[in-house]
Amino acid sequence: RQMCIRDSHSWMWAIVIAETDRVVTSGIVNFPSHMGSLNYGYASVGSWRMINKKLYNEIPDTDVRKGWWLDANKHSDNLNATQVAQATKYGCPAYTQMKYGPYKGVMAQSTNASDIPLMRVEEMYLILAEAQAMGGNPSTGAATLQKFVNDYRDPAYVCTASSATAVQDAVWQQRRIELWGEGLSYFDILRLNKGIDRRGAGFPAAYVFNVPAGDNTLIYRIPESEEQGNSLISASDNN
């Protein structure tokens, strides 16, 4: 189901939004505007939020999360007739996200008062599986990961990883799917020393990056104002 309101028992921490909050009344400079495909905002007028095509193709058809995005034929099993009609009217392209629904399920509205998820219990299962594997029990970590996915996402999933690093990579794959659009991938890329390869992933030519792991472009620079106002920071700290 679409994560449009804070009514799921899996939410542990969130930003609770009210219709009268300035982030809503000031216009469309808010999370639903940038992420929502079926409400009015930046995303629905062309700044579509789309999944990496290669990652999408790695999601099994038996995984319910595959419906969080439109497929190559602009279809999702997770959408009802009203949602399909709105996606068609807006012209949502293939691989557009359907994970985040509009506020109260009302199509095309500009009252973007959806609550914003910050932490869900699903992430805790993934953290546990990785911790078990990297703590010396890869078989336990693999079992934890498989049970979570089997119970809640894909009954056909089998974790074949046997080494600690292989289980860690399997967890990372699940994190990329489960936590898509929740602001965690950048930190995983740094933490796990991964690169960003967008070749063949459906991105516009100007954004087809192939950044190797550990590249300096992955590190945010210290703002110039901080460098100027803090005598303990020098230009060399940014190089």
Regions found by a protein language model. Give the residues of each.
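Residue-level signal for threonine
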Residues: 51-53, 223
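Acidic/polar-rich alpha-helix caps and helix-coil junctions
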Residues: 1-2, 6-29, 40, 46, ...
